[in-house]
């Protein structure tokens, strides 16, 4: 029948519809609930509006709000409502771009005379957005010629810039070369690739979060725009839960806790992204490093050390100056050894070239492989000031860097044992909810043949598949020198952090021309595996601080026990008990009774100490103490020897 079309559904079934039927019509034939919930459709792999006429034979799935694609669309459409509200309320304002992002959306604006948005402005904007939503304005898609688009957006220079580059800009261009727009009648139109919800009435569970400065196209030479961030969800309950998570995340912010708990700071005199660790933070970091060193020694790693700078030739050979120069600090030009022209030195951005030179320093035999090198190596990355963020994005960091040199035959076993080692060690620090991500060859920045990349990628895939964890594919996300598997860890409030990485590298061994002598007496190229377990000490410190909300487990806490006397005449015993605990290997202190006991206990709790011991007359007589555990019930008259045994067990078991 010529007037019918056949549509394939995700479950393999088929629907017959009248020719010209839309995705919305299809949803209605499946059921009234789906028709009500439908946001967009995926037609032959491409996202489309519900008004899209379906072609005969198409494979179609209907997208609902609770899915990732549905939420993405809701946030995208809400960004358009934000732009309309701002242009309504601020005459002379111009708008730039407004994409959906993880958990929300933003839109960039430029206000007349360099004005900025205020908190009161956000309230007004949000109120206007709710009016637009109540009007149920449709999202109407169109495609227009470039000259018409330029005339339509003549008062908005950033839109005109996008239009002029439409052929290369997926935010505006279509397959036909026309400029794609979406209109919300009667007064708003925007450049956009879409798709969008059917009308603004499908939105509403949103809030505007904050305003920040943002350079146009992320370029520091371009104008600074005003970026309004918001979040949008499919239900009121989901929005409320997200805002609660944000509140909890704010309480756990490592920058805030770092100051409150006297862990670290970023002095202006040193520079952006360069941290100093205070004694308490230094204690936590030392414990992290010491335990890691011990585990690496048990696993057969050999410890190496390398300098912080090198002549440029090393990074030319490694490819860093070709592929990573934007992330490196500028060179230091030195007249080395009296040479007239001098030599450029660079702060090292990575440790791997130095470890390769150690391998290459002498002839290697197959009997030495696998050779596992490990270093807590300081590296330096020139991060833009706009992306520097606490300890999670710094310019100077220490990586727990390992490089394994092995034969091709050993590679599979090494990757398997490496991944087991990584997951076990992260578990000892209290992270045990993981998934894995496999990052493949980047399209533009890559060295080596496609065949070599495929071989390395498959080796990583095989190792990851042996673990009982979800494996997510990150197409094109590999480093320029090889693919990687990264361990993604979820913290106590469900956020995901990229932790350890494992990379197979066929390229650097070739660039440095390293070899080993095989069983046949011939020279062979080793496989090189890069592995950073923490990523960097600084970033891992931040993750643990937020995971534990500053309340580090007893084995990591900078102070494990504080001893308090009930009265000032108990102070001598309190300090003597603290000294006994120190002698037993614990981190303990005591505080004089110069204020009421309740105030001293409260202050100790704000420092998030695992244990507070209180001693009075009976405790002095019986060698006992009142034990006040963090988050637990107070126990009175506990024998000090029993407490020592308990604390020792917690430390031994990493609790």
Task: Describe the residue ranges of each PLM region.
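NTP/phosphate- and nucleic-acid-binding module
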Residues: 1-76, 81-94, 102-104, 108-655
């Amino acid at each position: 029948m010529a007037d019918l079309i056949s549509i394939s559904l995700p479950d393999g079934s088929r629907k017959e519809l009248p020719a010209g039927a839309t995705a919305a019509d299809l949803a209605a034939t499946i059921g009234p609930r789906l028709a009500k919930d439908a946001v967009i459709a995926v037609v032959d792999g491409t996202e489309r509006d519900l008004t899209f006429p379906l072609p005969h034979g198409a494979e179609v799935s209907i997208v609902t709000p609770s899915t990732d694609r549905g939420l993405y669309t809701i946030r995208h459409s809400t960004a358009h409502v934000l732009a309309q509200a701002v242009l309504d309320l601020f005459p002379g304002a111009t708008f730039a771009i407004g994409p959906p992002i993880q958990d929300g959306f933003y839109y960039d604006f430029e206000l007349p005379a360099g004005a900025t948005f205020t908190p009161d402005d956000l309230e007004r904007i949000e109120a206007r957005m709710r009016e637009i939503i109540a009007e149920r304005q449709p999202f109407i898609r169109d495609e227009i010629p470039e000259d018409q688009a330029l005339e339509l957006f003549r008062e908005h220079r950033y839109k005109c810039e996008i239009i002029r580059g439409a052929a290369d800009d997926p935010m505006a261009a279509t397959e036909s070369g026309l400029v794609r727009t979406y209109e919300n009648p009667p007064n708003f139109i925007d450049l956009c690739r879409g798709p969008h919800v059917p009308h603004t009435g499908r939105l509403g569970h949103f809030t505007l979060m904050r305003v920040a400065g943002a350079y146009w196209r992320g370029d520091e030479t371009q104008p600074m725009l005003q970026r309004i961030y918001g979040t949008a969800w499919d239900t009121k309950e989901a929005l409320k839960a997200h805002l609660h998570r944000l509140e909890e995340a704010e309480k756990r912010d490592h920058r805030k806790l770092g100051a409150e708990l006297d862990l670290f700071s970023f002095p202006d005199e040193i520079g952006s992204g360069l941290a100093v660790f205070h004694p308490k933070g230094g204690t936590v970091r030392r414990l992290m490093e010491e335990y890691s060193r011990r585990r690496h020694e048990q696993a057969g790693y050999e410890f190496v050390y390398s300098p912080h700078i090198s002549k440029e030739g090393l990074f030319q050979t490694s490819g860093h100056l070709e592929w990573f120069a934007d992330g490196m600090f500028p060179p230091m030009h030195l007249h080395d050894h009296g040479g007239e022209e001098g030599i450029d030195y660079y702060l090292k951005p990575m440790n791997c070239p130095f470890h390769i030179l150690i391998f290459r320093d002498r002839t290697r035999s197959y009997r030495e492989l696998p050779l596992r090198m490990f270093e807590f190596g300081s590296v330096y990355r020139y991060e833009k000031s706009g992306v520097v963020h606490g300890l999670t994005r710094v310019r100077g960091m220490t990586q727990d860097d390992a490089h394994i040199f092995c034969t091709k035959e050993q590679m599979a076993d090494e990757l398997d044992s490496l991944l087991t080692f990584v997951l076990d060690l992260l578990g000892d620090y209290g992270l045990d909810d993981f998934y894995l991500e496999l990052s493949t060859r980047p399209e533009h920045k890559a060295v080596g043949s496609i065949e070599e990349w495929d071989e390395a990628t498959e080796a990583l895939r095989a190792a990851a598949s042996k673990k009982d964890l979800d494996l997510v594919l990150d197409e094109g996300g590999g480093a320029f020198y090889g693919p990687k598997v990264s361990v993604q860890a979820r913290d106590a409030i469900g956020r995901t952090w990229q932790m350890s990485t494992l990379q197979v590298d066929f390229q650097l061994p070739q660039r440095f021309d390293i070899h080993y002598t095989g069983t046949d007496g011939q020279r062979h190229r080793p496989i090189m595996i890069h592995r950073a377990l923490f990523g960097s000490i600084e970033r891992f410190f931040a993750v643990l601080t937020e995971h534990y909300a500053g309340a580090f487990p007893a084995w990591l806490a900078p102070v494990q026990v504080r001893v308090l006397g009930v009265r000032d005449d108990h102070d001598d015993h309190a300090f003597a008990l603290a000294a006994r605990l120190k002698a037993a290997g614990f981190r303990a202190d005591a505080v004089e009774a110069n204020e009421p006991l309740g105030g001293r206990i409260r202050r100790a709790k704000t420092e998030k100490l695992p244990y507070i011991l209180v001693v009075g007359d009976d405790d002095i007589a019986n060698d006992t103490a009142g034990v006040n555990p963090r988050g637990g019930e107070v126990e009175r008259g506990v024998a000090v020897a029993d407490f020592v045994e308990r604390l020792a067990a917690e430390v031994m078991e990493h609790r």
